[in-house]
Amino acid sequence: MLPFVLVLLVATSALAAPSVVISQDNINNIAPRVGNGRPISSALIDRAFEIVDGGDTNIYILTIQQILNDLADQPDGLSQSLAVTQAVAALGELATGVPGNSCEAAAVIDAYANSVRTGDNSALSIAVANYINRLSSNIGLISQLASNPDSLRYSSGPAGNCAGGGRSYQFEAAWDAVLNNANPYQIGLINEEYCAARRLYNAFNSRSNNVGAAITAGAVVAQTQAAQIILPSLVNVLSAVAAGGNVAGAAAQAGQALANAAANVQL
């Protein structure tokens, strides 16, 4: 049974340093989220994240998870697409015992920032295609994790060949553009997401860096036409994970759909 830990910060006065009280309870005592009748909801995102081990999940990753829950419950399609795309991206980074790198994420972030500045989308199309392939790899990892939680404990995440393992990219420029394009339903949540992702980007450990890059890249890709094409397949995978269904079958179908989308990216 998984523990649920509540951290309570208490300050006895305005000038006093806060004290910390930790209460541990069984997660089974916490009421699960209830679906809202739509295919995409906070219940879907929340249950999908239950497959990953919480040992490497720091407070900023938990913050991201709650933001994704809130985005999934928004009434607009872009917020829901963002929640699903970023959930798959983050779950892939949390699936393996040893972090990989974020070369594809860094490439799509840099290409997006450059395209906003220059108006040239040619490099962005290639980068989006490569990142969709990375999402396909993430789906494979999610499928393995759902089938056997111990199967990836000693495995490493995807490796690539890029400077610094994809830990350095145009973070601020990309998020400036993402925030400028946010709609009224999501602007507050996107700003919260930016703040949490920034802490992950500046963290010393590669797991946090990878999740920060995944969330940032997901925010970029979710705005493209390709995201709408792959969205149903991503939802099917998360639904199978959440329901304890045939994740392998959903992952196989999603892999084909993502391969087709990657081969036909249009911006």
UniProtKB/Swiss-Prot annotation:
Produced exclusively in the posterior (PSG) section of silk glands, which are essentially modified salivary glands. Keywords: Acetylation, Disulfide bond, Secreted, Signal, Silk protein. Partially N-terminally processed to yield a short form which lacks the first two residues of the long form. The interchain disulfide bridge is essential for the intracellular transport and secretion of fibroin. It is likely that the major role of L-chain is to prevent the retention of H-chain in ER by forming the disulfide linkage. Disulfide bonds join C103-C162. It holds the Pfam family L-fibroin. The keyword Signal applies. It comes from Galleria mellonella. The keyword Acetylation applies. The modification N-acetylserine is found at S19. One of its GO terms (cellular component) is extracellular region. This is Fibroin light chain. It is found in: Secreted.
